[in-house]
């Protein structure tokens, strides 16, 4: 067996969304901050392509790289690699990272609760793990400040006419549309249609509405389309199913933590949720995040909320990713039969 590289990975998913974690074999990227390190990963693409492209990966996966924290308050930091983006934050990936840190002993577990400060590329988050018998059973993540950007905005979409949408930020940037108004029910057999239409909506939203984070000049686009079903009552708690289309054209299997945070920010801005209120986010496969509006805050002069999300993650495997020096496809490849071609016109 020959290999010029060995990367150690712990496989994990959070409520259905794959968020594997690199625990060894990769040196920290250059950069004075975790955000700068993530910009290097985003522009270089060598690591992302190696772990996400075939034959080692696929468009359905995310991979997280553990790095030493830059902020002394944090016990660990990580960089999120999605198929197309390297975002400031991810809810499902933060739950995967927290679970791997504790279940593998990288960070000592304290039962019944372990409190951690972690450093995402976009800043610090607080994670509380509810632990029993050596397992982190649930993780509650207090997310970055989240805010509504444009409410009830008009979006022209070819073949559909004028849509009424909301744009918001919940650790990443979203265009939120009414799933039922477009004829969807948030069911697994709609996933391909969600992915295809979602990418058209993302392109149109970037062209017509745009987005600029008030304090992060580098984040100046809308990443995702969230198809949101109308609110229902879940034993007295507002609940909303969703399907989030992720670039280049896949559907989040989890309820999407940043998407739930963005939707809560919109619901708060519209007076539907207040501080202390709970919200249940449900995914296209029926998994759930238990969410809450923790506090009101502001960011860059904008009203915002501090949301939290809670869910489960499960370790699926460990792996050593290798590369044979004679392999003609060492960096991997992608084909449009499974990996959609993304281009923002």
Curated annotation (Swiss-Prot):
<dbReference type="GO" id="GO:0050346">
    <property type="term" value="F:trans-L-3-hydroxyproline dehydratase activity"/>
</dbReference>
<keyword id="KW-0456">Lyase</keyword>
<dbReference type="Pfam" id="PF05544">
    <property type="entry name" value="Pro_racemase"/>
</dbReference>
<feature type="active site" description="Proton acceptor">
    <location>
        <position position="90"/>
    </location>
</feature>
<feature type="binding site">
    <location>
        <position position="252"/>
    </location>
    <ligand>
        <name>substrate</name>
    </ligand>
</feature>
<keyword id="KW-0413">Isomerase</keyword>
<dbReference type="GO" id="GO:0047580">
    <property type="term" value="F:4-hydroxyproline epimerase activity"/>
</dbReference>
<comment type="function">
    <text>Catalyzes the dehydration of trans-3-hydroxy-L-proline (t3LHyp) to Delta(1)-pyrroline-2-carboxylate (Pyr2C). May be involved in a degradation pathway that converts t3LHyp to L-proline, which would allow S.novella to grow on t3LHyp as a sole carbon source.</text>
</comment>
<feature type="binding site">
    <location>
        <begin position="91"/>
        <end position="92"/>
    </location>
    <ligand>
        <name>substrate</name>
    </ligand>
</feature>
<comment type="similarity">
    <text>Belongs to the proline racemase family.</text>
</comment>
<feature type="binding site">
    <location>
        <begin position="257"/>
        <end position="258"/>
    </location>
    <ligand>
        <name>substrate</name>
    </ligand>
</feature>
<dbReference type="InterPro" id="IPR008794">
    <property type="entry name" value="Pro_racemase_fam"/>
</dbReference>
<protein>
    <recommendedName>
        <fullName>Trans-3-hydroxy-L-proline dehydratase</fullName>
        <ecNumber>4.2.1.77</ecNumber>
    </recommendedName>
</protein>
């Amino acid at each position: 067996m020959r290999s010029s590289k060995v990367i150690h990975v712990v496989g994990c998913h959070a409520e259905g969304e794959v968020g594997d974690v690199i625990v060894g074999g990769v040196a920290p990227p250059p950069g004075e901050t975790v955000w700068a390190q993530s910009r290097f990963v985003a522009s270089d693409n060598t690591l992302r392509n190696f772990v996400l492209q075939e034959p080692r990966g696929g468009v359905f996966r995310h991979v997280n790289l553990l790095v030493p924290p830059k902020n002394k308050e944090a016990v660990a930091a990580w960089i999120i690699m999605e198929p197309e983006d390297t975002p400031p934050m991810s809810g499902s990936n933060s739950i995967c990272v927290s679970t791997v840190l504790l279940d593998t002993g990288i960070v000592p577990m304290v039962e019944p609760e372990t409190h951690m400060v972690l450093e995402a590329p976009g800043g610090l988050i607080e994670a509380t793990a509810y632990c029993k018998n050596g397992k982190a059973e649930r993780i509650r993540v207090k997310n970055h400040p989240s805010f509504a950007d444009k409410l009830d905005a008009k979006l022209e979409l070819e073949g559909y006419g004028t849509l009424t949408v909301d744009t918001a930020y919940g650790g990443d940037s979203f265009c939120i549309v009414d799933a039922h108004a477009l004829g969807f029910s948030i069911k697994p057999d709609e996933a391909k249609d969600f992915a295809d239409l979602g990418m058209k909506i993302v392109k149109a939203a970037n062209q017509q509405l745009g987005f600029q984070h008030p304090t992060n000049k580098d984040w100046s686009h809308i990443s995702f389309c969230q198809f949101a079903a109308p609110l229902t009552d879940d034993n007295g708690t507002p609940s909303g199913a969703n399907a989030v289309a992720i670039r280049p054209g896949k559907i989040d299997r989890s309820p999407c933590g940043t998407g739930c945070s963005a939707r809560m920010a919109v619901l708060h801005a519209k007076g539907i949720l207040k501080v202390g209120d709970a919200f249940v986010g449900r995914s296209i496969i029926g998994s759930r995040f238990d969410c809450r509006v923790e506090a009101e805050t502001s960011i860059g002069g904008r009203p915002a909320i501090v949301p939290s999300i809670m869910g489960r993650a499960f370790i699926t495997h460990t792996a050593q990713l290798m590369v044979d020096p004679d392999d003609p496809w060492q960096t991997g490849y992608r084909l449009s039969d499974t990996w959609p071609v993304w281009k923002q016109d």
